[in-house]
Amino acid sequence: MKRDDDSGQVLLLIVAYASIALLLVTVVVGASAVHVERKQLLAVADAAALDAADAVDTDVLYGTGARPGAVPLSDRSVQAAVEDYAVAVGATGRFQDFRVEGATGSPDGRTAQVTLSARARLPLVSAVLGEYAAGVPLTVTARARTNLG
């Protein structure tokens, strides 16, 4: 019985498929980590928006008075409430490059708009994801409004 000339080719195929599988695992783990970190950042933004929606701007309240059914907010009161909340929950230490963005404020004097940004860390960095070794930039926005009865 004569042996074929293509003996040993199966090993090459196994190595190629194993490499592809490892790269696929790296990409899936990285995408999952980014998704989870984005959801955590969005949860902080939601909670900060809820907290900021109750941050009454006393200058507006006592100066011009409140409109019926609305808590008077200002960019300054929302920004201060969000920064205080972020420090209180430890968001600055939990997220890499955490920032409260300039879009944070009150666009209409009634709604608290919170925009946060951070970088998601990738647990596995390979040749495929090497471009994101410093992390993936994330930006989230949440809005909340408090209505008075």
Please provide the spans of the model-predicted regions.
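Alpha-helical assembly-interface signal, strongest on the long, hydrophobic N-terminal helix that forms
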Residues: 1-77
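Short secondary-structure transition/capping segments
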Residues: 5-10, 98-106, 140-149
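Residue-level marker of positions within ordered structural domains that often coincide
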Residues: 50, 87, 119-121, 147
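Soluble periplasmic/extracytoplasmic beta-strand elements of cell-envelope proteins
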Residues: 51, 113-117, 139-145
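Short amphipathic secondary-structure patches
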Residues: 51-115
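Low-complexity, S/T/G/P-rich flexible repeat/linker segments used as non-globular hinges
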Residues: 122-149
